[in-house]
Amino acid sequence: MFCNILGKIFTISCFGESHGKVIGCIIGGCPSNIKLSNIDVQIEVNKRKPGISKYITSRKENDKIKILSGIFNKKTTGAPIAIIIKNNDKKSRDYDNIKNIFRPGHADYTYWNKYKNIDFRGGGHSSGRLTANIVSASSITKKYLFKNYGIVFKGYVKQIGKNKILFESWDLINFKLNIANIKKKNIIKKYIKYINKIGDSCGANINLIIKNLPIGIGNPIFDKLNSRISYYLMNINAIKAINIGNGIKGIKYKGSKFNDIITKKGFKTNNSGGILGGISTGQDIKISIFIKPTSSIKIPQKSINKFNKKVKFIIKGRHDTCIGIRILSVAESMLSLVIMDFILNFNSYKI
């Protein structure tokens, strides 16, 4: 049995497959009277949809969303909200030659051993395509959190492959590469083109920031803010590691340098990434995520099939050379979901 529900108060349940008729989500625990239209949801979904840049997958999906329930007079009612997205640009025949093969880096091997019946087309239910549902739900959470608390979620690609990309300005970020350095633009473009030309893929490092989060969000022992953030983010395909604040860099520091000194005006530094004892400090929440190279590559690979026979194969189809570019919008969305869940729980203490 699949576990498809995320969240405690504000919940999301996802359904669908990469090459099925539709993908969709059911959102529960949403407060009433939030203004919400198809356009609000579409704006967010467009940030991650395929086919908008030559540097990502060429699969062209309109990703046109449709809200089925939970809205009346252009506002949320408090009832479950159902949103669907049709799958239009499917090429299932690209997977016929590998339907019995366990692709390295994919979920085929584990899914088959657990369920014995999997949809091999584009990864089926395990496909990153279902992250469009996460982004759909974030249209509600981002809007609610900004309007009521001024909370903002930002991010940028810090590294692609071996290429480190220094941050220059938020104004430089666009959806094609999601980098914040205009000087590195052409270098990154050439690098991705080269990796794509040789049929391989590359990983990425992304920095994420949550701004204006109030003090007191999170819990002291279990259900810490940092543990829930990590849990939500690790539910995104391809993310293999997470760093909060200067957690990794900090192993080189002495305690006298790592400790964030507190003054009457606030903290002098933010090595802890805005979280102490599992609870937000009021500073920016700083997170870094590490994305593995895309598993689907066009280079010949070796594996075994369902019959335990050795095989050599090539993956066809259309895939991202660097999935990290599109994961940015999904990661920002995931952060908004976990913060929404915490905020609603936090407010319940005031009743």
UniProtKB/Swiss-Prot annotation:
Iron-sulfur listed as a keyword: no
Positions annotated to bind NADP(+): 48
E.C. no: 4.2.3.5
Gene Ontology cellular component annotations, sorted alphabetically: cytosol
Pathway: Metabolic intermediate biosynthesis; chorismate biosynthesis; chorismate from D-erythrose 4-phosphate and phosphoenolpyruvate: step 7/7
Listed cofactors: FMNH2
Keywords: Amino-acid biosynthesis, Aromatic amino acid biosynthesis, FAD, Flavoprotein, FMN, Lyase, NADP
Organism superkingdom: Bacteria
Example of a GO biological process term: amino acid biosynthetic process
GO terms assigned for molecular function: chorismate synthase activity; FMN binding
CDD domains tied to this protein: Chorismate_synthase
Cofactor info, note text: Reduced FMN (FMNH(2)).
Catalytic activity: 5-O-(1-carboxyvinyl)-3-phosphoshikimate = chorismate + phosphate
Function: This reaction introduces a second double bond into the aromatic ring system.
Similarity annotation: Belongs to the chorismate synthase family.
Subunit organization: Homotetramer.
PANTHER family to which the protein is assigned, alphabetical: CHORISMATE SYNTHASE (PTHR21085:SF0)
The protein's name in its UniProt record: Chorismate synthase
